[in-house]
Amino acid sequence: MSVRHPSIIVIAHNIRSTHNVGAIFRTAEGLGVERIICSGYTPYPALSANDPRLPHLAEKLTRQIHKTALGAEELVPFATSTEPPLAALRQDGYVIAGLEQNPRAVPLPHYQAPPKLALLLGEEVAGIAPGLQTACDVLLEIPMAGRKESFNVSVAAGMALYQLLCHN
């Protein structure tokens, strides 16, 4: 990895698939992401204490996430939130970057990551809601050469995190 290593928090908002969540945890652990915030209806691993979900549901989701996370869900600190805590992160000095295709998005290879960055990922089909896009300090996009208009959210997260952490 490069000498410069920004502090990155991933916000996984309204991601439906436990397999995508697990893959994001595994990639985040491998690249040294500080923590993950699972917001909206994003499934998350069992909490160590006071998990508000029914025990059988928490166990089921944790097992499903573990299939792709392979233990990374136990190593990467995470929190849950009904909405992405953008104001609190900004107050802590984080720049909020949404990973989204948008005419105002900066191509990821042209973006210089600040020392503290919160990377917002949106749902698999619709991406980041327009209101949340507006709330971001910057939108980033992964340039595409193919005819499809998007990558899988966990794949996009991996490409973006690698670029931000290793090639910045």
Question: Predicted regions span which residues?
Answer:
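Short, glycine/polar-rich helix-capping loops at beta-to-alpha or helix-loop-helix junctions
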Residues: 61-66, 126-132
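Short amphipathic alpha-helical segments
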Residues: 23-24, 50, 109-111, 131-134
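RNA substrate-binding interface of SAM-dependent RNA methyltransferases
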Residues: 1-101, 165
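Short acidic active-site motifs
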Residues: 84-85, 107-109, 128
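Short beta->alpha connector loops at strand-helix junctions that form conserved
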Residues: 13, 39-40, 100, 123, ...
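Structured adenosyl-cofactor binding patch, chiefly the S-adenosyl-L-methionine
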Residues: 130-168
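A contiguous loop/helix-start segment that scaffolds small-molecule binding in enzyme catalytic cores
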Residues: 116-117
